Swiss-Prot record:
Homodimer. Signal peptide: none annotated. One of its GO terms (molecular function) is pyridoxal phosphate binding. This is Serine hydroxymethyltransferase. Its EC number is 2.1.2.1. GO terms for cellular component: cytoplasm. It is an enzyme of class 2 (transferase). Coiled coil: none annotated. It is found in: Cytoplasm. Its main location: cytoplasm. It comes from Methanosarcina mazei (strain ATCC BAA-159 / DSM 3647 / Goe1 / Go1 / JCM 11833 / OCM 88) (Methanosarcina frisia). The modification N6-(pyridoxal phosphate)lysine is found at residue 226.
């Protein structure tokens, strides 16, 4: 870091302040986590200097011997982790991975059946403001009004009506187990491709604490950060060699040029870390922590979407607390708790205001927090949201949160 301090003190100050924020604030953003020092070292390595258009053994540049080693390691480890045959580790992001899958088998105007963003889906699954919503005919599905969970019978009915070319399952704010086998059956009924986007739950999947879509989906996409605790990036698993060939062409030269070899090296490191028993235990603890936090909030009168959680996150509908998601996020931030406002199923407010907050336990679990700490966190959340305009009290909670964080440092 001394090089940055010497050359660019302004940026150094921002990085230093961000490090302080990460250490002393409690992060409950479900899509964030803390990468290991080894992962960050790989990201900052000399691999960043190398252009490597193409694929291992078939590059458009010379001097790729060692970046080939890095990419081959990442691919082999991903195959082992996920029990997959065909893997592409070059996508720069999860959205890019989804784009490559779409481009590999779909034509503009084809119908995609995917989860509505306001019900827990993702922008890249067909939101009107995303490329996916502009290029394809999107038919959204959502959760049941009664259970706030997926209704697979209704989903089958909708699939038969719209006859999609592709069905997308996976979400960014869905707290329940996804039945990938049932999705496969529905896709087969209508002759559709099945894409499973497991960006949020990939770590849980490789640890065996959430069912895997790999045996069922034609394509599986994921980010490599979030629960996988790797660098920011994407990955695609294809079911057959034929599909994999199409995906590889869609990634390069379809939507990308040179791969980010320093990021691919960091992916290799993260995949090796994810093979450890410690990682498996952390993923198991992540779910345990989410269940305890969820249960404590329910006992305090909070309305939990779908009544609970099976994974690393929960959605809190704040309508019964007479506060918006935006205001709750602001109050929590003043209390030292970082979360994000989120739409809830059958939302009536703007996405910039929302009626809910999304809470996740990956980051606090990586710090070493367990069930006992989640009970404390629930107390802090309750106090902050129920006293959202009491700045003095929010400052007191902030001190308690800071003290808690100091007991569980991110980086020793």
């Amino acid at each position: 870091m001394s090089y940055i301090e010497k050359i660019d003190p302004e940026l150094f100050e921002a990085i230093k302040n961000e490090a302080d924020r990460q250490e002393h604030k409690l992060n409950l953003i479900a899509s964030e986590n803390y990468a290991s020092r080894a992962v960050m070292e790989a990201q900052g390595s000399i691999m960043t200097n190398k252009y490597a258009e193409g694929y291992s053994g078939k590059r458009y540049y010379g001097g790729c011997d060692f970046v080939d080693v890095a990419e081959n390691l990442a691919i082999a480890r991903a195959k082992e982790l996920f029990g997959a045959k065909y893997v592409n580790v070059q996508p720069h992001s999860g959205s890019g991975a989804n784009m490559a899958v779409y481009f590999s088998v779909l034509q503009p105007g084809d119908t995609i059946l995917s989860m509505d963003l306001s019900h827990g889906g993702h922008l890249s699954h067909g939101s009107p403001v995303s490329f996916s919503g502009k290029l394809y005919n999107i038919v959204p599905y959502g959760v049941s009004k009664e259970t706030e969970a997926l209704d697979y019978d209704e989903l089958l009915k909708l699939a038969k009506e719209c006859k999609p070319r592709m069905i997308v399952c996976g979400a960014s704010a869905y707290p329940r187990v996804i039945d990938f086998k049932r999705f496969r059956e529905i896709a087969d009924e209508v002759g559709a491709y099945l894409l499973a986007d497991i960006a949020h739950i990939a770590g849980l999947v490789v640890a065996g604490v959430h069912p895997s879509p790999v045996p069922y989906a034609d394509f599986v996409t994921t980010t490599t950060h979030k629960t996988l605790r790797g660098p920011r990036g994407g990955m695609i698993i294809s079911k057959t060699e034929e599909l994999a060939i199409g995906v590889n062409k869609a990634v390069f030269p379809g939507i990308q040029g040179g791969p980010l070899m320093h990021i691919i090296a960091a992916k290799a490191v993260a995949f090796k870390e994810a093979m450890s028993e410690e990682f498996r235990q952390d993923q198991d603890q992540t779910v345990k922590n989410a269940k305890v936090l969820c249960s404590c909030l329910k006992q305090k009168g909070f309305d939990i979407v779908s009544g609970g959680t099976d994974n690393h996150l929960m959605l809190v509908n704040l309508n019964n607390m007479n506060i918006t998601g935006k205001d709750a996020e602001a109050a929590l931030s003043k209390a030292g708790i970082i979360a994000n406002k989120n739409t809830v199923p059958f939302e009536t407010r703007s996405p910039f205001v929302t009626s809910g907050v999304r809470l996740g336990t990956p980051s606090c679990t990586t710090r070493g927090m367990k069930e006992k700490e989640m009970e404390l966190v629930a107390d802090y959340i309750e106090a902050a949201i129920k006293n959202s305009e009491n700045d003095a009290l929010l400052s007191e909670i902030n001190i308690k949160v800071r003290d808690l964080c100091l007991k569980f440092p991110v980086y020793e």
